[in-house]
Amino acid sequence: MESKKVLNFYKALANLKEIEAKEPPYDTVTETGMVALYEICFEQAWKAMKDRLEFSGYAEQKLGSPRAVIKLAYQVNLLADEQLWLDALQARNNVAHSYNEQIALGIIADSRSKFIVMFEALKREIEENWV
């Protein structure tokens, strides 16, 4: 049985993939929605990782921040590419500046080109090895 946090991540990923199917040029509402859904998906992803790590017996005190979760998840092979996840964390942190259209478009481009694939790889890894 998958936890609520894992299921929330799967739903967030499905929502992100749905909006990412839209082609540019984007209107402001679509652009804002894409950035917001990226942020939500990232949040749900790291919380799902934390949930699976705790379920597998890793100490909660080692899992306080997204960065700590990413680093431990990489060490135990839940993630294949630590730097990509750290880049995704930085993009999530940049969401606060997404009123700047260049930052927003950068987040959207990275989401489309690499972060969705990254999220899908996490989903597969959880389903295959961390349930």
Can you say where each PLM-predicted feature lies in the sequence?
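Solvent-exposed interaction patches of small proteins and small membrane subunits
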Residues: 1-131
